[in-house]
Amino acid sequence: MLALAGVDTILLDRKSRQHIEGRVRAGVLERGTVTALEEAGVAERLHLEGISHDGFELAFDGAHHRIDLAGHTGKTVTVYGQTEVTRDLFEARIKDGQQFYFDVEDVVPDKLKSDSPSVQFVMGGQKYVVSCDYIAGCDGFHGVSRNAIPADVLQTFGRQYPFGWLGILVDKPPVNHELVYANHENGFALASMRSATRSRYYVQCDINDTVSEWPDDRFWAEFSTRLGPDIAARLQTGESFKKSIAPLRSFVAEPMRYGKLFLAGDAAHIVPPTGAKGLNLAIADIRLLSRALIEHYTAGNDAYICLLYTSPSPRD
C-alpha cells in the first residue's frame, strides 16, 4: 500500500525468505483482508486460487447446523494460506524495487521519541543503522519492537489456556466443502483446508501432550469421533506430512504506539488460532496504519496518525 502511494520502506526479518515461505500459518481471509490485498495490488493469485466460502458448519449434540454467512451478512470468507499471501507480498516488493533484508540479528529500534528514529541491526557480521521517519513493529509476539517501549509505559494482559491445539496437514480432499467447527465432550475439533486436495485438521488436546503421543491412527480416530458419524463418513484419512501442537493464549499490549513506533499484529495482540482471527486482525492494523502514513506523506495531514490506535476505527 505504501509503495503504491510512493512511500519508501525497508523490511527487516531475522529469518530467511525460504524459512518464512515454508511456515504453515493461517488460511482463512475475511472480507476486509481480501479488500486490503486488492487495494495493495496483490490479489490476482488469491482470486485465481482462493476458495470462497459462503458459510460454515457447527457440529454438536450429534447434529450439524450450517451458518449462512453470505445470507446473513452479505460477506464471504476466502481460504488462501498466509504463506501464499506472504509470497505475493514479497514478489510485489521485488517488482516495485523495495528494499528488504533477511537473516538479520541484534535488531534495536532506537530514538523512538525523537524526530529521527532509527533501527540498528547486524547482518553477515556487520552492523548497520537505518534512519527513518517511522517504525512499524510487525515482528510478532517474540519480536523486539514491543519491548522497545519502556517498562514503565508498556502494559500487558494475557491468559494461557489449559489445553493445546494439535494440527495436521494431509494431502487428502477436505471432509466438507466449508469449515466444520465441532464441539464434543472429548474436546473441540476443526476441519479446515488449504486447497481442494490439501486438508488442515485440528483437535484440542492436553496442554502437556507431545506430537509423539499422537500418531496418525490416534488422531484420525479421535477426529472422527468429534466430528460425528454423518460428517466422519466422508473423511478420507492418510499419512500426515505436518503435525504440531501449539499452546493457546490471549494477549494484549498497550499502548500500540510509542513515539515513532507503531505495533501491529501479534506484536500487540494475540488471540487463539481457533477463530482464524490473528492474520485478519494484523492486516486490519496495517490497513489503518498505511492510511495514516499515506495521509501524512501525500497530503501533509497528521490527523490520522494522531488518532491512530487511540479511538475506535472501522474494520471493514
Regions found by a protein language model. Give the residues of each.
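A conserved FAD-binding loop/helix module that cradles the flavin
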Residues: 277-283
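Active-site-adjacent segment of FAD-dependent monooxygenases/related oxidoreductases
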Residues: 22-25, 30-92, 96
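Glycine-rich FAD pyrophosphate-binding loop
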Residues: 3-24
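FAD-binding beta-loop-beta segment adjacent to the flavin cofactor pocket
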Residues: 247-262
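Short FAD-binding loop at a beta-strand-to-alpha-helix junction that anchors the flavin cofactor
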Residues: 259-272
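Conserved small/polar residues in nucleotide/adenosyl-binding loops
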Residues: 309-316
